[in-house]
Amino acid sequence: MPVNPYLTFRVATLEDVPTVLALLADDSTSGAQQGEYGETHRAAFEAIDADPGNELIVAELDGEVVGTMQLTYIPGISRGGALRMQIEAVRIASGLRGRGLGGQMLRWAVERGRARGCALVQLTTNKARKDAHRFYDSLGFVASHEGYKLALS
């Protein structure tokens, strides 16, 4: 396999959800949070799929899903009423990391945001993911804000 193979991207289908969950679970910082595929995942997918402000994207290599990310388009009053894109849950199959696929995914997402009229692309990442921080820095993202979460369940 080439060092930097070419990915194709598409909006996920319900049939992709188990593979997406497996990709999300293959992560040392949040993998245990995924749970087994079930009705809550189906309902979440259906809500995402029905919302034009959300896209669950899969990346394919030779017809196999090897990556995923969720894109959310957020209208706002700040920044002159700018539309922004939030990128979340970015994952590449662990056996394919380090081959430039994540860069392809993020560049594709940025172009998709630009095409939809977004003025800003933002993402959050776990503080423990130092390699991810270097990766996002290398793509031109700037660690300009501090994020907080409050678990409600």
What do the PLM-derived regions correspond to, one by one?
Residues 12, 90-92, 125:
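Hydrophobic adenine-recognition pocket in adenosine-nucleotide-binding enzymes
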Residues 81-94, 146:
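Conserved acetyl-CoA binding element of GNAT-fold acetyltransferases
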Residues 118, 137-146:
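Conserved acetyl-CoA-binding loop of GNAT-fold acetyltransferases
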Residues 89-92, 98-111, 134, 138:
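Conserved acetyl-CoA-binding loop-helix of GNAT-fold acetyltransferases
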Residues 122-132, 149-151:
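Conserved beta-strand-loop-alpha-helix junction that forms the acyl-donor binding cleft
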Residues 106, 113-125:
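Conserved GNAT acetyl-CoA-binding A-motif
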Residues 3-6, 11-18, 22-82, 88, ...:
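Acetyl-CoA-dependent GNAT
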